[in-house]
Amino acid sequence: YPDNVVKEFIHLAAKNGVDVFRIFDSLNGLDNMRLSIDTVRECNKVAEAALCYTGDILDPRRDKYDLKYYVDMAKELAAAGANIIAIKDMAGLLKPEASYRLVSALKDAVDLPIHLHTHEGSGNAIYTYARAVDAGVDIVDTAMSAMSCGTSQPSGSSLYYALSGHPRQPRVDVDAMNELSRYWETVRPYYKAADQTELFPNPEVYVHEMPGGQYTNLKQQATALGLIERWEEVKDMYHRVSMMFGDLIKVTPSSKIVGDMALFMVQNDLSEEDIYAKGDVLDFPASVVEFFEGRIGVPYQGFPQKLQQIVLKGRKPLEGRPGDTLPPVNFEEIKAKLAELEAPITEEAVSSYCLYPKVFTDWVKRVHDFGDVSVLDTPTFFFGMKIGEEIKVEIEQGKMLVIKLVHIGEANADGIRTVSFEFNGLPREIDIKDRNVKATKKKKKKA
């Protein structure tokens, strides 16, 4: 994003109550992080600068990202103004003994709190946290038990009990945590259709190295492309692509780039050898081309030059920091676009449009069509009301609507049903097009 968009977002987030900003770059590029660190400090907020973990510091064969690499980066982040150093282990690759060595080394290298974030995909995250606690880690990320494990974080309650008898056992109200977990235990089943998290440990993550937040998304993409029967091939190709790209650090957006290339290769039955042999006639995914152009920065130790030349097909890569090549956004022009959409013209709306123009536009259109459906309870939103059911909807503080569904009529020739309901005790009717019913009445063509 252009620098003025990044700065505006941080200022607005701080204004709206965000106190701690976790700042990371998908390629661990410090130059891409400086602007955010400086802006957060200008806002008198906490800049938590993250080093993204990949590889295995215990494996001498994976020496690109060794212990010295992470220690040196932590020192650079501290010098750049970070208040906290985060270890962002987005795929859950940090093994227990590696966490002890890494946290110990960082505690010796910088006089800042160390915050560890990992995922439970391998099943080893609790042990990883326990060893990090032994090494002096200051903060770890956990999840409520009902939302934990799989590609999520380990359970906070489980960690509490795992550290029983340890001098650094967290001083938390575990009964209150368990009560909150029971709430999420009730809510989670409503989202089952979108919940593709594996409910069992899968140490294969140490092989494919796919971030926890990407695993389910890529699986859905594979399903949409008709590749779910070849999911094992996709996972294998994901790792192959990562190594082709130079043993890449994989976190948004670099992880998506690797995923796009893996799907592209499996869908087209391409091997690594095919890429080098036929690359001049292949139409690579846009995200892959932009990556090799340097639009998200330059990987540690640079691009694999031969592959870069094949993908770019004679185009020149960018020079310098990507943000320096982007002109500032004209916020007044964005306000004019919001006016055309009949969207609220607020600082937050402008920033949202700058960050996600299509998503924001689709959301505005949906609100225009259906109103603010976020006020509905989850079962009603997903499944609708049953005949005789009554719900209460708070549309703003102190303003409650009581709605009761009374009757749904038969569909007419146009596929229209009359829905009868009570609105705050008063009878109402509305005609709704049933999209599951084919109209039997033929419409006359206009002249």
Feature locations, PLM:
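Catalytic alpha/beta core domains of metabolic enzymes, predominantly
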Residues: 90-287
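Alpha/beta enzyme core
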Residues: 1-116, 129-137
